[in-house]
């Protein structure tokens, strides 16, 4: 099983695998290209995003700067708005629905690392170099969600349609549809 097949299967994989590193390097360079554009370079920005992302719905806008890890594992619906410093570490798939709005400094993270150090570093190359391992869990965000500034979404989380996540929240568990959550860890505040 290749490292990419392991990644897709949700089992421990080596993110430093040359094939995976090449995909990430390409995406990281495209992030830099996007971040070097002016906001009025709409066509240039759209072309770069088309190269980075798995899917991007019409009418979407990214303030920039952006940081995608693989990019191609991120699927974004129509009329998405991403404010400054959007970071998506998409080792697993990330699905973002239509009409979502993200405040500045939103981070979506899909990789997890084993809690036991020996498991994180259990594989070594012939020269003794540690191969740090991780696995990844997909993140799903429904339509019409709003994330305040500084929200972090952790691996494996699903955020229901119409949910609002308050500024500075760390979302470690699923969020129900049409609810307001906030805090660290994010907790239910009320139905909306």
Give the role of each language-model region:
Residues 152-182, 186:
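C-terminal/domain-terminus segments
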């Amino acid at each position: 099983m290749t490292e990419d097949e392991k990644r897709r299967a949700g089992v421990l994989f080596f993110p430093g695998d040359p094939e995976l590193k090449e995909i990430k390097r390409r995406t990281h360079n495209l992030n830099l290209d996007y971040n070097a554009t002016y906001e009025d370079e709409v066509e240039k920005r759209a072309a770069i995003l088309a190269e980075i992302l798995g899917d991007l719905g019409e009418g979407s806008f990214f303030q920039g700067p952006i940081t995608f890890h693989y990019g191609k594992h991120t699927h974004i619906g129509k009329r998405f708005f991403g404010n400054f410093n959007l970071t998506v570490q998409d080792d697993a798939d990330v699905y973002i629905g239509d009409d979502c709005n993200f405040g500045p400094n939103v981070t979506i993270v899909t990789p997890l690392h084993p809690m036991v150090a020996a498991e994180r570093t259990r594989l070594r190359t012939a020269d003794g170099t540690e191969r740090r391992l991780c696995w990844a869990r997909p993140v799903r965000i429904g339509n019409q969600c709003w994330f305040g500034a500084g929200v972090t979404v952790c691996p494996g989380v699903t955020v229901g349609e119409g949910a609002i996540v308050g500024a500075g929240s760390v979302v470690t568990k699923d969020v129900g549809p049409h609810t307001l959550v906030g805090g660290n860890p994010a907790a239910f505040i009320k139905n909306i």
